[in-house]
């Protein structure tokens, strides 16, 4: 599942490999990551990078309190899509934001409602629209 997601991603197309983020020999971080997840992301997608986060601060980009789970890059760009018997979360590896509209159409978990389980996809769509009208992916167009 994760491998299939990954080979269709822009990361794969740009030569990023599994080992760019993961260490097969194990680390102190979850999922055998080489560094904390958001630190890995910011290595390439920092504030001065043309590829993101497109806001002065992470909190402004995510609309979640700084240092909260919702402000982590993987919360939106690698949402949890399954859980194994060993209580291991399986995350999407397309690195694309799955909008609530995509969730409705494709019947896949979206980045908002994976955490906001008490809310509807309509609530999530309205929240995204209130954040910006500049980015079509945020409003699911």
Where are these regions (language model features)?
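Inter-heme linker and motif-flanking segments adjacent to c-type heme-binding CXXCH motifs
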Residues: 1-134
């Amino acid at each position: 599942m994760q491998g299939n997601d990954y080979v269709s991603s822009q990361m794969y197309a740009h030569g990023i490999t599994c080992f760019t983020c993961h260490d097969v020999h194990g680390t102190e971080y979850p999922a055998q990551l080489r560094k904390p997840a958001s630190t890995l992301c910011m290595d390439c997608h920092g504030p001065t990078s043309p590829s993101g986060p497109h806001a002065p601060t992470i909190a402004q980009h995510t609309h979640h309190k700084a240092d909260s789970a919702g402000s982590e890059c993987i919360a939106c760009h690698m949402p949890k899509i399954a859980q194994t018997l060993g209580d291991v979360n399986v995350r999407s590896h397309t690195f694309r934001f799955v909008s609530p509209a995509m969730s409705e159409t494709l019947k896949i978990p979206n980045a908002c409602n994976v955490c906001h389980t008490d809310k509807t996809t309509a609530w999530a769509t309205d929240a995204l629209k209130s954040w910006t009208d500049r980015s079509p992916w945020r409003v699911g167009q």
